[in-house]
Amino acid sequence: MEPFTFRKATEKDLQTATALIEQAKVFLRENGVDQWQTGYPNEGAIAGDLQRGEGYVMEAEGQVRGYACISFAGEPCYNDLEGNWLSDLPYGVVHRMAIDNSCKGKGAAPAFFRFAEELCKERDIHSIRVDTDGDNRMMQRVLEKQGFTYCGTVCFDNSEKIAFEKLI
């Protein structure tokens, strides 16, 4: 059994999720990654996730230690992929994943992706897609280790992202 549990985020999680995102911004900056350094994501983005029922938290030892948006509504910018998706199947999307620094290197991000895969399977969805910055090698390694395949690039918020897909 994994040391992490997952649940749908509630309004009560907004401040904690926002703090995790802010902590992740600092971590990325300190590690030379330009991703999330322009103000986004912010509390408003997370509040939108919660309103749409797409926000999820990861708990460890009774504390919220991770946040991600897991959506099944599609991602419009993925329609303009420069490259090729593995499939044309309906898909889940993981956005805005942030893991508390205390859980980094302990399998938290892979566990969150496995949780997202389970949510997909519950909905009879057999594809999951993710995008990240080209300089975020940490996330790219996590994705590769979890069986995601590089598919090309997309433009998101006026920034080019690299896109991955995994068939499940």
Question: What are the roles of these predicted feature ranges?
Answer:
Residues 25-45:
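Conserved GNAT-fold acetyl-CoA-binding loop/helix
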Residues 99, 105-118, 141-145:
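Conserved acetyl-CoA-binding loop-helix of GNAT-fold acetyltransferases
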